[in-house]
């Protein structure tokens, strides 16, 4: 019997020269919470880039590894690395079956990378992915437009709100900031 592993809400918020990415810690298999403190956001490239993932964990780690190789290959050029990963992801026989989404950000740019070959830069200074992504996204937009909270506070409060709505999102938040 194969049960779908569900996990995650990850959000990126850019405000006042800061980029913050935060993710909850829950991994769920079927109706069971398997882990409550998974690390879904991390810094790479000497702390200059933040990455986050949603989807199948093994798939996401494979893609993060490939992305990190591309970042090094292109000397930290986030956009070029993202575009090249998206091309690989879409055309490689093994990679195209991977089920995950990636958020990546550096001091200037935030991008969503998908297996469809999409590399999307947000119109707003917020991006969110995962099972609770829409809840976190809506919360963050409201907080950005109606409060003076910092990027970190907006990211964390948005995940807390998503966790109250989405059963696949918990309140154990890990945050990274550049």
Swiss-Prot record:
Supply the Pfam families for this chain: Proteasome
Question: What Gene3D superfamilies does the record tag this protein with?
Answer: Glutamine Phosphoribosylpyrophosphate, subunit 1, domain 1
**One biological process GO term for this chain?**
proteolysis involved in protein catabolic process
Q: Which domain of life is it from?
A: Bacteria
Summarize where Na(+) binds, as residue positions.
163, 166, 169
Regulation affecting activity: Allosterically activated by HslU binding.
A GO CC annotation recorded here is: HslUV protease complex
Q: What is its EC number?
A: 3.4.25.2
Keyword Translocase tagged: no
Q: Which CDD domains match?
A: protease_HslV (cd01913)
| Reactions listed under catalytic activity | ATP-dependent cleavage of peptide bonds with broad specificity
Bilayer-crossing regions:
none
* Places the protein is found: Cytoplasm
Q: Name one GO molecular function term.
A: metal ion binding
Family in the record:
Belongs to the peptidase T1B family. HslV subfamily.
Enumerate the PANTHER family for this protein: ATP-DEPENDENT PROTEASE SUBUNIT HSLV, METALLOPROTEASE TLDD
Could you tell me what this protein does?
Answer: Protease subunit of a proteasome-like degradation complex believed to be a general protein degrading machinery.
**Assembly behavior:** A double ring-shaped homohexamer of HslV is capped on each side by a ring-shaped HslU homohexamer. The assembly of the HslU/HslV complex is dependent on binding of ATP.
Q: What is this protein called?
A: ATP-dependent protease subunit HslV
Q: What is the native source organism of this protein?
A: Treponema denticola (strain ATCC 35405 / DSM 14222 / CIP 103919 / JCM 8153 / KCTC 15104)
Q: Which gene encodes it?
A: hslV
């Amino acid at each position: 019997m194969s049960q779908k592993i569900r996990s995650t809400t990850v959000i990126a918020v850019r405000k006042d020269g800061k980029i913050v990415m935060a993710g909850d810690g829950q991994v769920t298999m079927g109706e069971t919470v398997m882990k409550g403190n998974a690390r879904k956001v991390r810094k790479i490239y000497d702390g200059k880039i933040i990455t986050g993932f949603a989807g199948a964990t093994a798939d996401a780690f494979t893609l993060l590894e490939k992305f990190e190789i591309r970042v090094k290959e292109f000397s930290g050029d986030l956009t070029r690395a993202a575009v090249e990963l998206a091309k690989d992801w879409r055309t490689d026989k093994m990679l195209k079956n991977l089920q995950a989404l990636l958020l990546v950000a550096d001091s200037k740019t935030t991008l969503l990378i998908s297996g469809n070959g999409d590399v999307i830069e947000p119109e707003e200074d917020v991006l969110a992915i995962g099972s609770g992504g829409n809840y976190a996204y809506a919360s963050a937009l409201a907080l950005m437009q109606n409060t003076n909270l910092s990027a970190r506070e907006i990211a964390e409060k948005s995940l807390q709100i998503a966790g109250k709505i989405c059963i696949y999102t918990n309140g154990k938040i890990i945050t990274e900031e550049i």
